[in-house]
């Protein structure tokens, strides 16, 4: 088997859709028994003062946009999902909306997350930003 260079791997990833990359990451995590999630410090209940929790929330710089439900205007939500998530075809966007709750965007800036949430809610979807 030929060894691929880093540039060749990146070129292959650029050609993949978001769903294909997500499946790849899951299989990679399972194969090598690792996780791509950032480590999170878990404090015991009541151990940290309330002010510390507020400071931690203010320091958060990456947010996930999660589609909770499509609502009554499913077609409009599908159109917005295609607009927000680059590289999605109509079928992939429909599958994503049908499979709610699903993350649409991961580790994006607060402004991008808020903008996506506003567009989705305007289309009739229920969305959370974490």
From Swiss-Prot:
Positions of disulphide bridges: none
Additional comment: Was identified as a high-confidence drug target.
Protein name: Large ribosomal subunit protein bL12
GO terms of molecular function: mRNA binding; structural constituent of ribosome
Gene Ontology biological process terms from the UniProt entry: translation
Organism taxonomic ancestry: Bacteria, Bacillati, Actinomycetota, Actinomycetes, Mycobacteriales
Source organism (scientific name): Mycobacterium tuberculosis (strain ATCC 25618 / H37Rv)
Self-association and partners: Homodimer. Part of the ribosomal stalk of the 50S ribosomal subunit. Forms a multimeric L10(L12)X complex, where L10 forms an elongated spine to which 2 to 4 L12 dimers bind in a sequential fashion. Binds GTP-bound translation factors.
CDD domains referenced in this protein's UniProt entry, alphabetically: Ribosomal_L7_L12
Primary role: Forms part of the ribosomal stalk which helps the ribosome interact with GTP-bound translation factors. Is thus essential for accurate translation.
Similarity field: Belongs to the bacterial ribosomal protein bL12 family.
HAMAP family for the chain: Ribosomal_bL12
Gene: rplL
């Amino acid at each position: 088997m030929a060894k691929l260079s880093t540039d060749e791997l990146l070129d292959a990833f650029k050609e993949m859709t978001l769903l294909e990359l997500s499946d790849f990451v899951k299989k990679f995590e399972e194969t090598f028994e690792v996780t791509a999630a950032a480590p999170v410090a878990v404090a015991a209940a009541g151990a940290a003062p309330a002010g510390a929790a507020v400071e931690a929330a203010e320091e958060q710089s990456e947010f996930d946009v999660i589609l909770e439900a499509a609502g009554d205007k499913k077609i409009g939500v599908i159109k917005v999902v295609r607009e927000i998530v680059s590289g999605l075809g109509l079928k992939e966007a429909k599958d994503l909306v049908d499979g709610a709750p699903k993350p649409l965007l991961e580790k994006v800036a607060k402004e991008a997350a808020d903008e996506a949430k506003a567009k989705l809610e305007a289309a009739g979807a229920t969305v959370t930003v974490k």
